[in-house]
């Protein structure tokens, strides 16, 4: 894969991505599959679920789940649950990235992402303000991103329209309106869950490397 982004010890414009999808399954089943796959990969290399990554001791035998809102609330003692409930989704995500993300050392599936920051994800049946989505963090780094695919063409068109408004107001990460995709959804798509894993970061973790350049065949990052 390619992204027009800068170089760092955690990012490279060219990187390896593993994506997998399954129809007629649940988010919880996909979370379990992802956890077992990572455990198996580590055991094959390290013969243990307890590994070292840089200065951190990581226990891959103990994955947990936590909601994004609860994690933000726990790290920001000046905020109340009412503050969180009233907060814009983009602001909540920004707080998470700035105050929580790098503290998620042990394997954590973060769930409960706001719909505003999940434009391709299906709404949760019990709470339509959040998406059926997870991100997996290990060692303070995002390893995987997965969600139930949004297969409602009307909802998807509405989400794209909101993304266009965000782009017009300066959001550089907002998406354009993909009319072809909406038309494809109108022809029908089964319920499905998809996951993307950054293979380079996963290899970094399993082999205890602290720079992405050490797991790339042709790194652009200088020593």
Predicted stretch roles:
Residues 1-29, 33-37, 63-223:
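A translation/RNA-centric and nucleic-acid-associated enzymatic feature enriched
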Residues 38-45:
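A common structural junction motif
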Residues 46-57:
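Short, glycine/acidic-rich hinge or "gate" loops at secondary-structure transitions
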């Amino acid at each position: 894969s390619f992204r027009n982004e800068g170089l760092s010890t955690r990012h490279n414009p060219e990187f390896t991505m593993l994506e997998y999808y399954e129809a007629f399954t649940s988010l919880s089943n996909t979370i379990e599959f992802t956890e077992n796959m990572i455990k198996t990969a580590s055991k094959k290399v390290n013969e243990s679920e307890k590994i070292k990554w840089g200065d951190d001791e990581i226990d891959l035998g103990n994955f947990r789940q936590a909601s994004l809102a609860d994690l933000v609330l726990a790290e920001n003692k000046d905020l109340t649950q009412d503050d969180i409930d009233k907060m814009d989704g983009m602001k909540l995500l920004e707080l998470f990235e700035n105050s929580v993300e790098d503290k998620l050392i042990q394997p954590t599936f973060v769930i409960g992402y706001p719909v505003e920051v999940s434009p391709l994800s299906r709404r949760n049946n019990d709470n339509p303000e959040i998406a059926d989505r997870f991100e997996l963090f290990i060692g303070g780094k995002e390893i995987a991103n997965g969600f139930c695919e949004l297969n409602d063409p009307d909802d998807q068109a509405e989400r794209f329209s909101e993304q266009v408004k965000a782009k017009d107001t300066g959001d550089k990460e907002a998406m354009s309106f993909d009319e072809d995709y909406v038309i494809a959804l109108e022809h029908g798509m089964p319920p499905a869950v998809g996951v993307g894993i950054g293979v380079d970061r996963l290899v970094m973790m399993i082999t205890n490397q602290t720079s992405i350049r050490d797991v790339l065949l042709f790194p652009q990052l200088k020593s």
